[in-house]
């Protein structure tokens, strides 16, 4: 079987390639060239491509480069900026996995004669049959600290059926040990912690460089709608933020809502950060073909958080037909839920599906 492995230049993808070689697959390495050449705005990718080439040489496999810069710019970077314009806080990695890393990448791999693709993601794929329907299920990785299934919840059945995650049963420590034993140059390379195209995790720098004219100063308001100050622009704030507000209220205040239509930022007390429910759109269901009635789930609205108990309710239109949107009702109010982020639904360590948080019903906000 011919497998095209995405080599990012990091240790995880390098070990994924090595494991597949050891298992007898016909492996080729590819690096997705994603970042446009705009000096001073985006991160540089040159070193990553060079490191990936060195890894491929060490493993004795061919290395190629897929130039995806144009599509990445329109589908991910432009999306990222537009979401901020709309007052939301996007998760570009969530969209990128669906459209680029397992979308465009898979399409090109199949055109080039490969049977499957593989990456260094920490997650598991399980083939099974549910109610007479063959399904490819997505599960959390063994290493809970490194599990990345949250970012993969938009993957379709076709994408899952054509993908391999060799690291699903490995800890990060074991991966580094394998890389060291194999003499790979990136065995101790630090993990990437931020969005791939954002230097130093400085979102506003990228947004201001690409769309500074789209943002204006506006009003800070309290949860009753009273003006209490002036903000610098919506791009500087995110739900739950406390620092940098420059508001003296006599008690700590946090960003609890952003409204692009009125160009206002609502601030409130800690208890006003909590949400009763959310509406998720662009929902993808993995566990079964459809969900047509309310079910009990666990949900994550941020990557680094514990799963929380909730009800998942499919929404229907006036003709009682599915809208593709779902309501999530938290059993206990959830803190700092942000529009634009990913909501991912779980049962045990299986991913039911996920979508984009479209709206949030917060406690005590007009």
Curated annotation (Swiss-Prot):
Q: Which InterPro entries match?
A: MnmA-like, MnmA-like_C, MnmA-like_central, MnmA-like_central_sf, Rossmann-like_a/b/a_fold
Catalysis performed (reactions): S-sulfanyl-L-cysteinyl-[protein] + uridine(34) in tRNA + AH2 + ATP = 2-thiouridine(34) in tRNA + L-cysteinyl-[protein] + A + AMP + diphosphate + H(+)
Q: Where in the cell is it found?
A: Cytoplasm
- Annotated positions for site Interaction with tRNA: 121, 341
Region feature (Interaction with tRNA): 146-148, 302-303
Q: Which portions of this protein are annotated as coiled-coil regions?
A: none
Q: Name one GO cellular component term.
A: cytoplasm
- The record's disulfide annotation reads 96-196
Question: EC number(s) for this protein?
Answer: 2.8.1.13
Q: What class of enzyme is it?
A: transferase
Q: What's the main place this protein lives? A: cytoplasm
Instruction: Decide whether keyword Chloroplast is in the record.
Output: no
One GO-annotated biological process of the protein: tRNA wobble position uridine thiolation
Question: Catalytic positions?
Answer: 96 (nucleophile), 196 (cysteine persulfide intermediate)
- The record lists ATP as bound by 6-13, 32, 120
UniProt-listed Gene3D superfamilies: Adenine nucleotide alpha hydrolases-like domains (2.30.30.280), HUPs (3.40.50.620), Translation factors (2.40.30.10)
> Which CDD domains does the annotation name?
MnmA_TRMU-like
Q: Which UniProt keywords apply?
A: ATP-binding, Cytoplasm, Disulfide bond, Nucleotide-binding, RNA-binding, Transferase, tRNA processing, tRNA-binding
GO molecular function terms noted in the UniProt entry: ATP binding; tRNA binding; tRNA-uridine 2-sulfurtransferase activity
Task: State if Transmembrane is listed as a keyword.
Answer: no
Q: What does this protein do?
A: Catalyzes the 2-thiolation of uridine at the wobble position (U34) of tRNA, leading to the formation of s(2)U34.
Looking up HAMAP family in the UniProt record yields:
tRNA_thiouridyl_MnmA
- Extract the PANTHER family matched here: MITOCHONDRIAL TRNA-SPECIFIC 2-THIOURIDYLASE 1, TRNA 5-METHYLAMINOMETHYL-2-THIOURIDYLATE -METHYLTRANSFERASE
Identify its protein family: Belongs to the MnmA/TRMU family.
From the Swiss-Prot or TrEMBL record, give the protein name: tRNA-specific 2-thiouridylase MnmA
- Organism equals Treponema denticola (strain ATCC 35405 / DSM 14222 / CIP 103919 / JCM 8153 / KCTC 15104)
Gene that produces this protein: mnmA
């Amino acid at each position: 079987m011919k497998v095209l492995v995405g080599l990012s230049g990091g240790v995880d993808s390098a070990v994924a390639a090595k494991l597949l070689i050891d298992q007898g697959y016909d492996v080729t390495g590819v690096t997705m060239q994603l970042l446009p050449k705009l000096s001073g705005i985006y991160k540089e990718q040159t070193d990553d491509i060079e490191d990936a080439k060195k890894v491929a040489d060490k493993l004795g496999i061919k290395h190629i480069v897929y130039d995806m810069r144009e599509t990445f710019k329109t589908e991910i970077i432009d999306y990222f900026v537009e979401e901020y314009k709309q007052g939301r806080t996007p998760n570009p990695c969530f969209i990128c996995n669906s459209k680029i890393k397992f979308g465009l990448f898979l399409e090109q791999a199949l055109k080039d004669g490969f049977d499957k693709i593989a990456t260094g993601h920490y997650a598991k794929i399980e083939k099974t049959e549910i109610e007479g329907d063959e399904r490819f299920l997505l599960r959390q990785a063994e290493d809970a600290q490194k599990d990345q299934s949250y970012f993969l919840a938009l993957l379709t059945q076709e994408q899952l059926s054509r993908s391999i995650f060799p690291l699903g049963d490995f800890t990060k420590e074991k991966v580094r040990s394998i890389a060291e034993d194999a003499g790979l140059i990136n065995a101790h390379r630090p993990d990437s912690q931020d969005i791939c195209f954002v230097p130093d995790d400085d979102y506003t720098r990228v947004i201001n460089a690409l769309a500074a004219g789209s943002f204006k100063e506006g009003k800070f308001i309290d949860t009753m709608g009273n003006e209490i100050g002036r903000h610098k622009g919506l791009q500087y704030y995110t739900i739950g933020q406390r620092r940098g507000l420059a508001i003296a209220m006599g008690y700590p205040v946090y960003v609890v809502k952003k409204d692009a239509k009125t160009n206002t930022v609502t601030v409130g007390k800690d208890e006003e950060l909590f949400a009763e429910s959310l509406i998720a759109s662009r929902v993808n269901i993995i566990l079964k073909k459809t969900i047509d009635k309310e079910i009990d789930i666990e949900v994550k609205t941020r990557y680094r958080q514990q799963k929380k108990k909730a009800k998942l309710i499919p929404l229907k239109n006036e003709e009682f037909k599915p809208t593709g949107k779902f309501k999530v009702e938290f059993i206990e109010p959830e803190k700092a839920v942000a529009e634009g982020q990913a909501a991912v639904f779980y049962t045990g360590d299986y991913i039911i599906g996920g979508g984009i948080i479209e709206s949030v019903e917060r406690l005590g906000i007009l």
